[in-house]
From Swiss-Prot:
It comes from Drosophila willistoni (Fruit fly). The keyword Disulfide bond applies. This is Alpha-amylase-related protein. Belongs to the glycosyl hydrolase 13 family. SUPFAM superfamilies: (Trans)glycosidases, Glycosyl hydrolase domain. GO terms for molecular function: 4-alpha-glucanotransferase activity; alpha-amylase activity; metal ion binding. Its main location: secreted. Pfam families: Alpha-amylase, Alpha-amylase_C.
Amino acid sequence: MRLSLSVLLCLGLALTLAQHNPHWWGNRNTIVHLFEWKWTDIADKCERFLGPRGYAGVQVSPANENIISEGRPWWERYQPISYKLVTRSGNELEFASMVKRCNDVGVRIYVDVLLNHMSADFEGLATGTGGSVAEPAKKSFPSVPYTADDFHETCEITDWNDRFQVQQCELVGLKDLNQNRDWVRTKLIEFLDHLIELGVAGFRVDAAKHMASEDLSFIYSSVRDLNINHGFPNNARPFIYQEVIDHGHETVTREEYNELGAVTEFRFSEEIGKAFRGNNALKWLQSWGTDWGFLSSGQALTFVDNHDNQRDSGDVLNYKSPKQYKMATAFHLAYPYGISRVMSSFGFDDRDQAPPQDAQEQLISPEFDADGGCTNGWICEHRWRQIYNMVEFKNTVRDTELTNWWDNGDNQIAFCRGSKGFIAINNNLYNLSETLQTCLPAGEYCDVISGSLVDGACTGKSVSVDGNGYGYIHIGTEDFDGVLAIHTDAKL
């Protein structure tokens, strides 16, 4: 009996550790969230942009059928009606083609999955993006099928410090599934297994804190291994990262979930926003990471903003503060902490705004200007030079340590990543002009923030590094960006 228990414990530990592995190709190590993109567009950009630029993976919007809401707000994607793979992003064939094409060029796909709930109340019969009908008010979803027996009793979350309410009542009216029921577990596992069969590498689990960790543990451990026909090794487990909003005073905590998979580290987003908005001196970022109360690096899915909190007021940065946003993202990708995800947004003026769509309410594909930036209402932060070049920086310096931290006692900082990379940031209202240790071999390096290395020439500023590793660093207040970054793969 003791031996059997030990074996079971070891197997359980192995499974949970495996669910922290994102299965990246080579030295790639950054995910991009292509929020509300069509599957055909993602496939094309995996081949033409994401793969060549060194992105490791794409988080895609929910793939299963959702309710059709008036005006088509973005959040309708979070109101599922069945597990058919039909949404405004495309159908199952298009989804499968996207996954294969992206895997073929080394870009993994992670699906935003909704295991907590089905659609909220809807007047009369609700119609889904795949033609299914349901009566959410009666908890009737025949295309699954689910009946009222498959849900928790109807109740509202009024006390966020009450575990029962948080995990068994309805989040903003969404019909709360009972993941302790065998039938519900079976349908959720079938859904995840189908996505794995199509070649996905893992899942972002929406509203994870609203489900008991023991129920999620059962579901995660029951899904199949990743599909070896898509380049995954034998016995590989899906990468799982879970949305658990924990500001440090929650009854349901992130620590209940971080052994099951990675957890979205919302404190990272909040604190990096405070720092680069000028509400906390950058000098304090030297101890960034667990010393700030964050999860351990391998358990934390980190981001400057996400599709939810970029729409909130407060300290979180988004694309509307571009200079500070680029500085924060550069720091995010340069500092050796966390599993990094960058945001790719569409423009919005109000919280509920739909993604770019035509008169028939079909999603519009992004188009591109002469500089490669997106048009048609898409922001595409991942295509900003200052961000995609930092993805390359992060790839180049992977597995190196942070060394030679420098700061001016305020909002100017710099540091090395081993002998492969150097970054400096100026968030003061006066120039940064210093001779600093870059830790790089002697030579001329292209600043990948102000430009790129193209055919052996730099389109932006360059930095001369002497035989002792020192270089003169200037970031003026008049500069378009408050960052300078150089690395060994950008040597002239």
